[in-house]
From Swiss-Prot:
Required for maturation of urease via the functional incorporation of the urease nickel metallocenter. It comes from Pseudomonas entomophila (strain L48). The lineage of its organism: Bacteria, Pseudomonadati, Pseudomonadota, Gammaproteobacteria, Pseudomonadales. One of its GO terms (cellular component) is cytoplasm. This is Urease accessory protein UreF. UreD, UreF and UreG form a complex that acts as a GTP-hydrolysis-dependent molecular chaperone, activating the urease apoprotein by helping to assemble the nickel containing metallocenter of UreC. The UreE protein probably delivers the nickel. It is found in: Cytoplasm. The gene is ureF. The keyword Cell membrane does not apply. Its main location: cytoplasm. Belongs to the UreF family. InterPro entries: UreF (IPR002639), UreF_sf (IPR038277).
Amino acid sequence: MNTDLALLRLLQLASPGLPVGGFTYSQGLEWAVEAGWVRSVAGFAAWQREQLHDTLGYLDWPVLARLYRACQADDAEVFAYWSRFLLANRETSELRLEETQRGSALARLLDGWQLGQDPAWRNGLELSQLGGMAWLGAHWAIPLRDLALGHGFAWLEGAVMAGVKLVPFGQQAAQTLLRDLGEELPAVLDHALVLDDEQLGGGLPLLAIASSRHETQYTRLFRS
């Protein structure tokens, strides 16, 4: 696949129009706002920066790299292992449900294209959105670094749009957050791509608490 087409496929995977329900989740932010943990643009930036450096840097991106390489090597067993590892590191039932819902949605998209139909791959694809992104990234010859940055920006954009509704703040602040937090993505990715297996795993106690409390939050806009 030529580089122009690979770029277009990456934009498709990173698009908010990808039918995986990206903007229906806040990943605990909704309860953090209600609890008073996040009250301002600065508070939101600090909340997301923690997740960027911990969850993205030590879990999502390193796992994405391993999933991608498993796809390149046509190793469904390794792919399934890291898919299960990712799901096991989602610390609440709500976050695990979000992961499998996103994964199933992307797997259904692959079904429509008659891709990833081998049961050895299909079962792993249903476990996480990262699995589907890795599979399509390898299939479409999207370079790993580009794929990871596209995924990271899509994650950040979804979080900022949730913040617009919840904190709240305006579009100027939203774009400034995307600009400023986005500048940190390449350095975090550099570190994520050189981690050894035993260094992987995310753990943010406040995020886990917020997600747990959100499960029973009386009035809410988001599914997580």
